[in-house]
Design a protein with these regions (language model features):
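Active-site neighborhoods and metal-handling regions in enzymes and metal-associated proteins
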Residues: 1-85
Length: 85
């Protein structure tokens, strides 16, 4: 088990963006699931971040096919994200 964050005393505030990532390794198989949530209502800036990152993920998935390198997939994602800064 790997922890990406350290629990603390800070209470979640309205508009905070949370990422919950669960990874399982069992019998040589790796499974990973990640979900983003907003505490309350997202600000305009946070909503843009959530929308752009979700669309970037979809474009990365669409780019995967035989012969395409991880670098090619990353480039597809990066180009999309940089157009939406």
């Amino acid at each position: 088990v790997v922890c990406h964050g350290i629990p603390g005393e800070r209470v979640l505030a309205e508009g905070d963006v949370l990422n919950i990532d669960v990874t399982v390794i069992l019998d040589g198989w790796h499974g990973d699931s990640s979900r983003m949530y907003v505490a309350g209502t997202a600000s305009t800036k946070a909503r843009l971040l959530l929308d752009v990152t979700y669309e970037a993920m979809l474009r990365g998935v669409e780019a995967v096919r035989p012969g395409v390198t991880l670098g090619d997939v990353g480039h597809t994602i990066q180009r999309f994200v940089e157009r939406h800064r």
